[in-house]
Amino acid sequence: MSFNKAKALKTAAKYVQQGKYQAAIEEYRHIAVADQTDVTTLNTLGDLYVKVGQTGEAIHSFLHIAEHYRLTGFYLKAIAMLKKISKLDPN
């Protein structure tokens, strides 16, 4: 069975709208595994982790995004992501 990203995104958005954040996290995790360069999904996933109090997981998602931006030459975006991380964990 092939992965339908559009359907998964729609399902995840529905879960967020319903306040079912843990279910949304699971959907976004599946999407992130299927497309590891989708920084929008990773950012949304990180934001959801923050919302449910899983700061460590959020930082992991945001670090992945920052590294992607660094490797692709988008240094200002990488710095912005690192600033987002520093707000979650000032140390």
Per-region residue spans from a language model:
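Repeat-based scaffolding regions
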Residues: 1-91
